[in-house]
């Protein structure tokens, strides 16, 4: 049985938000690096850097908070396609989150990208998660 790295990212960020932790450490894989790159581009996290301990490589994410109440920019995140149930979408039916306010992260034949980029390139793929 394998690990669901995308669910690990989402859960780690959610748990860090609950305890108001500024940084999160996740295991670095090609998939997690691409998802972190998208979260960084879209402004959901403040910074991401690589950290190495022995043979293992980690990504250290700095969460982005707003206001005095220290609310994170990620209000809701949900894993859509799971290892036991894959969910795919063609290029015409790529979903939008909150009318474009959130981001859908897809895995396509041209790599992991956002819903906007997939619509622009007119390609579909596996819907990995929603972030708003």
Swiss-Prot record:
TM ranges: none
SUPFAM superfamilies: Ribosomal protein S8
GO CC, one annotated term: chloroplast
Subcellular location: Plastid, Chloroplast
InterPro entries reported for this sequence: Ribosomal_uS8, Ribosomal_uS8_CS, Ribosomal_uS8_sf
One function term, GO molecular function aspect: structural constituent of ribosome
Alphabetical UniProt keywords: Chloroplast, Plastid, Ribonucleoprotein, Ribosomal protein, RNA-binding, rRNA-binding
GO terms (BP aspect): translation
Pfam families from the UniProt entry: Ribosomal_S8
Main location: plastid
Domain of life the protein comes from: Eukaryota
Family of this protein: Belongs to the universal ribosomal protein uS8 family.
Subunit structure: Part of the 30S ribosomal subunit.
Function: One of the primary rRNA binding proteins, it binds directly to 16S rRNA central domain where it helps coordinate assembly of the platform of the 30S subunit.
Protein name (database record): Small ribosomal subunit protein uS8c
Organism: Cycas taitungensis (Prince sago)
Gene label: rps8
């Amino acid at each position: 049985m394998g690990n669901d790295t995308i669910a690990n990212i989402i859960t780690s960020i959610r748990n860090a938000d609950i305890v108001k932790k500024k940084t999160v450490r996740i295991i670095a894989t090609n998939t997690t690096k691409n998802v972190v790159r998208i979260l960084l581009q879209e402004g959901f996290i403040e910074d991401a850097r690589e950290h190495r301990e022995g043979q293992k490589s980690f990504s250290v994410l700095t969460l982005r908070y707003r206001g005095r109440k220290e609310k994170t920019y990620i209000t809701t995140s949900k894993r859509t396609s799971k290892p036991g149930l894959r969910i795919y979408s063609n290029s015409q039916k790529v979903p939008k989150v909150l009318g474009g306010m959130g981001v859908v992260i897809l895995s396509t034949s041209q790599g992991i990208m956002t819903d906007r980029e997939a619509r622009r390139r007119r390609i579909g793929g596996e819907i990995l998660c929603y972030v708003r």
